[in-house]
Regions:
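Short, acidic/charged, Gly/Pro-enriched secondary-structure junctions
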Residues: 84-113
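Helix-start/capping segments and mature chain N-termini
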Residues: 1-76, 86-90, 114-155
Length: 155
C-alpha cells in the first residue's frame, strides 16, 4: 500500500447483506443512478492507535439525518436505526479497519423506474480510508465574507 488512501474495502453492505466489493452491483437503469434519486450520509471514523480502537463520529445523529432525508425524498423503506448502526459496525469489523475512515451510507431507488419512483429502495454502506487533511495538523486560514444572502421573500 503506497499510502492511506489506496485502501479499498474487501466487503460492502448491499441491500442488507455483506457482499464482496467486486460483486456489489446496481443497474445502470436504476433511478438512483440515472436520476440521482438517492440520499446519503458521510460519516467519519477515527482510529486511535494508542487505544487500538476505531471511534465513529456521531453515528446516531448521522443515521437519524439519513432517515429524515429518506422521509423528505419519500423513499419507501423502513430504516431501523439500531440495525443500520449494527450493520455499519459489522462492516468495519469484517474489513478489519484500523485507520481513519470515511463511511458512506446511502439509500436509492433501485431496479428499473423513472425519476418519480418511490421503490424499490436499495441501500449500501461502503467504507474506505480517508486520512486527516494536512490542515488538521498545520491549521488553515479562513476569512468571513461580508456579503449577505438576499431574503428568500425579496423580489
Amino acid at each position: 500500500m503506497k499510502n492511506n488512501t489506496d485502501y479499498k474495502p474487501e466487503y460492502v453492505f448491499l441491500d442488507g447483506k455483506i457482499v464482496p466489493l467486486k460483486n456489489a452491483k446496481i443497474s445502470v437503469m436504476a433511478p438512483g443512478f440515472t436520476f440521482a434519486v438517492s440520499v446519503f450520509e458521510g460519516i467519519r471514523a477515527y482510529w486511535n492507535k494508542d487505544k487500538e480502537q476505531l471511534y465513529i463520529f456521531r453515528i446516531d445523529e448521522h443515521i437519524k439525518r439519513l432517515k429524515f432525508s429518506m422521509i423528505v425524498m419519500e423513499l419507501d423503506l423502513e430504516l431501523n436505526e439500531e440495525n443500520f448502526k449494527r450493520d455499519i459496525i459489522q462492516l468495519l469489523k469484517i474489513n478489519k479497519i484500523k485507520r481513519d475512515t470515511y463511511i458512506r451510507a446511502q439509500t436509492y431507488i433501485n431496479d428499473w423506474g423513472n425519476m418519480m419512483s418511490k421503490k424499490p429502495v436499495g441501500s449500501s454502506i461502503i467504507c474506505h480510508s480517508r486520512p486527516r487533511l494536512k490542515a488538521y495538523y498545520e491549521g488553515k486560514r479562513f476569512s468571513v465574507s461580508s456579503w449577505r444572502r438576499n431574503s428568500e421573500d425579496s423580489s
